[in-house]
Curated annotation (Swiss-Prot):
Protein name, per record: Glucose starvation modulator protein 1
Gene3D superfamilies named in the record: Zn(2)-C6 fungal-type DNA-binding domain
GO biological process terms held by the UniProt record: cellular response to starvation
Family listed: Belongs to the ERT1/acuK family.
Pfam families: PAS_13, Zn_clus
Keyword Repeat attached: no
Source lineage: Eukaryota, Fungi, Dikarya, Ascomycota, Saccharomycotina
Statement: the UniProt record of this protein carries the keyword Metal-binding: yes
Localization: Nucleus
Compositionally biased tracts (Low complexity): 66-79, 91-104, 178-188, 621-652
Keywords assigned by UniProt, alphabetized: DNA-binding, Metal-binding, Nucleus, Transcription, Transcription regulation, Zinc
GO cellular component, one term: nucleus
Annotated PAS domain residues: 522-591
Length: 707
């Protein structure tokens, strides 16, 4: 009985890389030294040898298994009877003693020693002779004379293994348990078929001479064990050895004759030629026997050869670390013809199966001339003529006539006369141009200049936080807030710039603007179905859409907001709301892909006073073209009328009559909202537009429940 090990011995012992034959059969813990401890303890140290590992089925053929089983001495000397019966079916190794060989008629063989008759004809003759009661075996079994090496029916060509240092020599061996008496007839038809299969295998493989040129090389995957973990390793090894496949593409292999002989021998022995994998470098065309591994190999080849990082996100900065090749592989690369090799491999992958190429081909047929046809085709396909914006009664007739004269339905998507135009187009104008989805594809697309928008934003921030006519302490505090905001903008804007540097100008920029207008139409339809007041603005902060109920709450008109460049920060009441906005936007601008923000914000009413001086009407007078002055009393009356028309709750104010109606929501200067911001990103994962929904916080009083 095996001695029980102590816990200390179990921790100190190390597993062996390969067990010996005895330990493998007895399921014992083997050691690395030879002879191992178990064999020394049992006095069988002379028989301690490494076990021959079982090879993976899809890396070797049935013919090579038969050769290995026939040339291994242990297969006929030390194996049990049960394993010998199993080896008879897969790898025949039956031999005859010299005393059982009788003269043979040489007329049945040609000059090269091959039988003239077909094995099936010989088998038919043997069956007829056995049925007639003849006492002798068929003439094919009576072998002597010019074939002395046929006394052992073993193939003469061998396969080089890991441990062999010289070519193996075939020696005649006698096995009494498998020999057949010379005068005994075959007992059954199965025995005759087995004997004939042995003889045909010998005659098909005997014509290969035993010399170094005909000895096959070792398979490069011979060291792998039969585990599922090695499938990925095999795929990567094949990817790193693509220069063998390039050689096979350029010229046929030198050992084509040897492969044909092996295939013919495998067909004669009854094995399927489709399952036999040729050994050596010429096996690259038959990748794997598994369709899953073939697909994995082809997909890895596509990724390694044609993929490239296209996003400036931090996750792609370390992609080059995984694309490095080992030094052993670079030694085998021909740097003179390296581009030719890559083209050969790519062409081989294209010929292997149809796939979608990762990246843009150099000979792309997509030109600017085809974009006109694409515009007409898209105009026919998109029949969404329902406008989500409608005609505004507040817009001027002159503005509509100017827009109608500037754009027409027959213009292409890209107008080369205006593609480099930097003229600013207000959101109200774009609402009149793109009223339906079909208008985006049929009318001229105007490019949006983000740098000019950032310059206007910087000018507004400097004006807002200038702190004129304020004490020194208040002015220093405003300047500190301005520095915080500028640092936040500088943290994410370089990423936006780097993402746009790789674009094809102006086509990609126009495509991004088309995507923006397409999403804007959908979100405006959604805001009409939603009861909450909504504002939609770009990533620069410029407002592009606002609902009527929010306009009525704040006392603005649509022309006041959308007829010029108006930022969301302009209608924020205090400096803390502006600083908090940039902090929240910086958190979702780069890296973090969260799409919603919950916060509180104070929005200025029309005509309300801003802390630190100034009013909301003039926006600090930084844009004098659209400076609208309204009196405070008129604003209050407009607020009350708009609130009554939209069904909002209003208060009677201090006086009980209807002369001085005021908006009872918020204060006279601002309204505090609970807001939810939804971030919509473009194809670079950069915020494209932000949808803000604002719910006013009602004041506490009689009839108002507080939570």
């Amino acid at each position: 009985m095996t001695k029980r090990l102590t816990p200390q011995e179990k921790l100190s012992r190390k597993p062996a890389s390969r067990a010996c034959t005895f330990c493998h059969q007895k399921h014992l813990q083997c050691s690395n030294e030879r002879p191992c401890k178990n064999c020394v303890k049992r006095n069988i140290a002379d028989q301690c040898q490494d076990i021959t590992r079982k090879r993976v089925k899809y890396l070797t053929g049935a013919n090579s298994k038969a050769v290995a089983a026939a040339t291994t001495p242990e297969a006929t000397t030390t194996t049990p009877k049960r394993k010998q019966k199993r080896s008879v079916k897969g790898s025949p190794s039956i031999s005859f003693p010299s005393s059982s060989i009788s003269p043979i008629n040489t007329s049945t063989f040609d000059t090269n020693g091959h039988p003239n008759g077909h094995p099936n004809d010989l088998l038919r003759q043997s069956l007829e002779a056995s049925q007639a009661g003849q006492a002798q075996a068929p003439s094919l079994l009576e072998i002597q004379g010019p074939f002395p090496q046929m006394q052992t029916l073993q193939p003469t060509h061998t396969v080089a293994s890991e441990t062999s240092s010289s070519y193996s020599q075939v020696q005649p061996q006698h096995h009494p348990e498998s020999s057949v008496p010379p005068s005994a007839p075959p007992e059954s038809v199965d025995q005759l078929q087995q004997l004939m299969m042995h003889d045909s295998a010998y005659f098909n493989t005997n014509n290969v001479a035993l010399n170094p040129t005909n000895v096959l090389e070792a398979d490069p995957f011979d060291g792998h064990t039969n585990t599922m973990l090695n499938t990925t390793t095999d795929v990567l090894n094949k990817l790193l050895n693509d220069h063998y496949e390039i050689d096979n593409i350029l010229q046929p292999p030198d050992d084509a004759l040897l492969v044909d002989q092996q295939q013919s021998s495998s067909e004669a022995t009854g094995t399927s030629a489709s399952k036999a994998v040729p050994m050596g470098p010429s096996h690259s065309n038959t990748h794997f026997s598994s369709n899953y591994l073939n697909e994995e190999y082809l997909m890895l080849g596509d990724i390694l050869l044609q993929s490239k990082p296209t996003s400036p996100s931090p996750s792609n900065t370390s992609a080059s670390e995984y694309n490095m090749l080992s030094p052993s592989y670079t030694q085998n690369i021909d740097f003179d013809n390296i581009h030719l090799s890559k083209r050969k491999v790519v062409q081989k992958l294209k010929d292997s199966r149809p796939f979608i190429s990762l990246g843009f081909p150099k000979d792309s047929s997509l030109s600017l001339d085809n974009l006109n046809n694409m515009a007409h085709q898209t105009d026919n396909l998109l029949d969404n003529n329902v406008s989500s914006r409608g005609n505004n009664n507040t817009s001027n007739q002159k503005l509509q006539s100017a827009i109608a004269s500037k754009t027409s339905k027959t213009n292409p998507i890209i107008n080369f006369a205006t593609k480099y135009s930097t003229e600013y187009v207000s959101p109200l104008s774009t609402h009149q141009i793109y009223q339906t989805v079909s208008d985006i594809y049929s009318k001229d697309v105007l490019n949006y200049e983000y740098p000019n928008s950032y310059h206007a934003l910087t000018h507004f921030l400097k004006t807002r936080f200038s702190g004129n006519n304020l004490p020194h302490e208040e002015k220093a505090r405003k300047r500190q807030n301005l520095l915080v905001i500028l640092k936040l903008i500088a943290s994410y804007r370089p990423t936006f710039i780097s993402a746009h540097k790789s674009l094809l100008k102006p086509q990609d920029l126009l495509f991004l603007e088309m995507s923006f207008q397409r999403c804007l139409i959908d979100y405006e339809k959604l805001s009409q179905l939603n009861s909450s007041p909504t504002i939609i603005w770009r990533r620069t902060g410029e407002i592009v859409s606002i609902t009527d109920d929010l306009l009525s709450l704040l006392g603005y008109k649509l022309l006041d907001i959308l007829s010029k460049r108006t930022f969301i920060m302009e209608i924020m009441y205090d400096d803390e709301s502006i600083v908090k906005y940039f902090q929240l936007f910086k958190s979702v601008a780069v890296g973090n892909l969260h799409s919603s923000i919950n916060t509180k914000v104070k929005l200025i009413k029309n005509g309300g006073a801003v802390p630190g001086g100034g009013t909301s009407n003039g926006k600090y007078n930084y844009n004098n073209n659209y400076n609208h002055n309204y009196s405070h009393n008129n604003n209050n009356n407009n607020n009350s009328n708009n609130s009554n028309n939209n069904g909002m709750s209003t208060g009677a104010g201090n006086s009980g009559d209807g002369d001085g109606l005021e908006n009872n929501v918020g204060t006279n200067s601002y309204i505090e909202f609970c807001s939810v911001w939804t971030v919509k990103r473009d194809l670079f994962d950069i915020p494209m537009l932000i949808i803000g929904q604002f719910l006013p916080i009602l004041p506490a009083g009689d009839g108002v429940r507080m939570y």
